[in-house]
Amino acid sequence: MIFTLRPYQQEAVDATLNHFRRHKTPAVIVLPTGAGKSLVIAELARLARGRVLVLAHVKELVAQNHAKYQALGLEADIFAAGLKRKESHGKVVFGSVQSVARNLDAFQGEFSLLIVDECHRIGDDEESQYQQILTHLTKVNPHLRLLGLTATPFRLGKGWIYQFHYHGMVRGDEKALFRDCIYELPLRYMIKHGYLTPPERLDMPVVQYDFSRLQAQSNGLFSEADLNRELKKQQRITPHIISQIMEFAATRKGVMIFAATVEHAKEIVGLLPAEDAALITGDTPGAERDVLIENFKAQRFRYLVNVAVLTTGFDAPHVDLIAILRPTESVSLYQQIVGRGLRLAPGKTDCLILDYAGNPHDLYAPEVGTPKGKSDNVPVQVFCPACGFANTFWGKTTADGTLIEHFGRRCQGWFEDDDGHREQCDFRFRFKNCPQCNAENDIAARRCRECDTVLVDPDDMLKAALRLKDALVLRCSGMSLQHGHDEKGEWLKITYYDEDGADVSERFRLQTPAQRTAFEQLFIRPHTRTPGIPLRWITAADILAQQALLRHPDFVVARMKGQYWQVREKVFDYEGRFRLAHELRG
């Protein structure tokens, strides 16, 4: 059988060849689920001059990648205990990570290219099996090239797996294993051009879980204990949900149900017809799992329930209904789940997506790379005033799309000098100034990036202020603006309110150029909801008219000066141990 690469697959191959002709640095290709990564891998392995090792984390992917290479009329070795083959001397070897890592002695020969499928699984731990393999192969050949392929280059708890994107944006930091993303294809392109089945999403407002009270852990993920606790409170809902899924499934061939926890999954499968449903969890023995997957693909039963174990490396094209009964913490994970139902199959016209968890993700939205925050936040485009780069941040818009707030910190654009050295644009949308040198630092920085001065921790500052008899600390719940004139000219008064009713104010004069510049620096810049986008004003009345574009601080610290309180510190973007206004803490 001869395969003709689709245009985007050829572009991915060309991008790889061009990159490795000019660079030795590790690179990654981002292709959505169903884009045919196996064919791209096969073509690259065919074109490579030296030996190639292709790694995958499950035997199904090893077999799939090997089959596509064989379909080109070429022979290759397989090194995977799960496939009962351990060959390692051919020009091209397809191996499972576990088997190769345990048998590095069998890989003493030199490889010129290492390809890692589902490369987002590579951990930072030097003792991980991926890192052991990479270290070993690099010792044998210091000029080894590394290429990764994935549909999800951003992982919660880990961040971006690469540093620079070929569209000119910075993603990860210098610790990222892959330096460059050299090619990326959006999901929308695949669906628009008929390479994937169109999804038909139905939000299920009548019966759905409410996970809004859940708080993600520091790694961005929800804990299983918290999920089980919420599900127990809402256990009466599950039978109604399953009943509705079965109604929708009556005309469907394959149904995948994504549960929140193992306990939840067992409850779900108990509500489905026993002869027509199966459950796969991380604890399912390998042999049993293989049989279940084979029977599901052969359509011997309709419902397959799982807990986040079939989000990658699983190919069942007949699936035409995806039911999501778990909160998904990122756009990437949501796209992975939905992607299980988007492969083309005979007679399949769409894939029904039933979301019973109120997930706020847009299937076509770009991955922003930071936690979404509030559910009404959306990806917004913000141009850097310094370099002009079009950043994508979380933000808020009006109904007509007008930007009213964004949460970007630093421009994501990068430059390359004549020597090929890359540097990120230094413009910061939100920052805190160093008290010693006035350099702008990230709002979470502990030390100044210019002079290394230790920056004041907001918690320490608030704690110290609370001890002082002549200090007032406001847990700020709002602010109001008032303007007027006197013999010295125009002024603007800002009053900050504590949730308990106390208030403190500050006043700015706006008559001279120096006064107006000070007002811009001391008030407009820290208070604007849209940093980087100038607030147009001539008079104080213009400021009042745009008050909706200004934010109040989280805390205000004032000191007594004579008979009046004088504002000394304002704390924004606070994340610490003190409660915010109107915030409930257990």
From Swiss-Prot:
Single annotated GO MF: single-stranded DNA binding
CDD domains xref list: SF2_C_EcoAI-like (cd18799)
Ranges for domain Helicase C-terminal: 241-386
Identification of the protein by name: Putative DNA repair helicase RadD
PROSITE patterns in alphabetical order: HELICASE_ATP_BIND_1 (PS51192), HELICASE_CTER (PS51194)
Enzyme class: hydrolase
Recorded domain comment: The C-terminal domain (residues 356-586) is required to alleviate the deleterious effects of UV or ciprofloxacin (CFX) treatment in a double radA-radD mutant; its effect on ionising irradiation (IR) survival in the single radD mutant were not reported. Crystals have 4 domains; helicase ATP-binding (residues 7-185), helicase C-terminal (residues 187-365), a zinc finger domain (residues 376-425) and the C-terminal domain (429-574).
SUPFAM superfamilies reported in the protein's UniProt record: P-loop containing nucleoside triphosphate hydrolases (SSF52540), Zn-binding ribosomal proteins (SSF57829)
Keyword Transferase recorded: no
Protein source organism: Escherichia coli (strain K12)
Known function: RadD contains helicase motifs, suggesting it may be a helicase, although that activity has not been observed. In combination with RadA is important in repair of double-strand DNA breaks (DSB). Has DNA-independent ATPase activity that is stimulated by single-stranded DNA-binding protein SSB. ATPase is stimulated by a peptide with the last 10 residues of SSB, but not when the peptide's last Phe residue is missing. Binds ssDNA; binding is slightly better in the presence of nucleotides.
Stretches the record annotates as Zinc finger domain: 376-425
EC numbers for this chain: 3.6.4.12
Domain Helicase ATP-binding: 18-171
Record key words, sorted: ATP-binding, DNA damage, DNA repair, DNA-binding, Helicase, Hydrolase, Metal-binding, Nucleotide-binding, Zinc
Cofactor list: Zn(2+)
Activity across pH: Optimum pH is >7.5.
Enzymatic reactions: ATP + H2O = ADP + phosphate + H(+)
Amino acids binding Zn(2+): 384, 387, 411, 425
Region (C-terminal domain): 429-574
Gene name per UniProt: radD
Changes seen on gene knockout: 100- to 10000-fold decrease in survival after IR. Double radA-radD deletions have nearly 10(6)-fold lower survival upon IR, and the double mutant is more severely affected by UV radiation than either of the single mutants alone (up to 100 J/m(2)). The single mutation is more sensitive to dsDNA breaks induced by CFX, the double radA-radD mutant is inviable upon CFX treatment; the SOS response is slightly induced in the single and more induced in the double mutant. No effect on RecA-mediated conjugational DNA recombination.
